[in-house]
Regions:
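Surface-exposed, low-hydrophobicity beta-strand/loop segments enriched in small/polar/acidic residues
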Residues: 1-177
């Protein structure tokens, strides 16, 4: 996953493993993606920004901005572990740019939305393809719409595909709650 919201494996945070919260079902069997609700899911810790691991095919240390779910990590000769290290942008006040899946009305500004469910077939050479689900805004969702990103190529808020700036909803982020 690349640029996707990330939470800890369980709602207590005791596991310490990252999970992709943009999938419809997360590793802790909670809802993710469009089903995320801050009152019932593991709270978000940030946005995935790459991983370091030993490539299982080449046995070489590797950094990748995106990691497919099918990726198998090789054994690290220094630690004898097959774990990778995930890097997460965890500043709870960080703003992000995301494409909207529908028109963003004036009334939608300040509202909260989730990302649409991501599937493996959506992968585009390591680039994020997630979109903000504008059709189902609710106060317990992941991201709050802040403003238009003012991207000259994608700033028509009356059409799907406009870039908008979002920030974590304080009730959905582990560090803002």
């Amino acid at each position: 996953f690349k640029g996707n919201p990330v939470s800890l494996e369980d709602s207590s945070g005791s596991q310490g493993y990252l999970q992709d919260a943009s999938f419809s079902t997360t590793d802790d069997t909670g809802g993710g993606g469009v089903d995320f609700a801050s009152g019932t899911e593991a709270l978000l810790v940030g946005v995935f920004n790459g991983a370091f691991f030993v490539d299982n095919t080449t046995n070489k240390p590797t950094f990748a901005n995106s990691v497919a779910a099918a990726q198998r990590f090789g054994t690290n000769p220094n630690t004898n572990s097959t774990d990778g290290i995930g890097f997460v942008n965890d500043d709870p006040h960080q703003e992000y740019i995301i494409k909207a899946d529908a028109a963003v009305t004036r009334a939608a500004h300040g509202q909260c939305g989730n990302v649409n469910d991501f599937t493996a077939t959506d992968a585009k050479n390591g680039q994020s393809t997630i979109t903000l689900d504008v059709g189902a805004l609710a106060e317990d969702h992941m991201f709050r719409i802040v403003r238009s990103a003012e991207d000259p190529e994608n700033e028509d808020l009356t059409a799907a595909g406009a870039n908008v700036v979002v920030a974590f909803n304080s009730s959905a982020n582990l560090y803002l709650k």
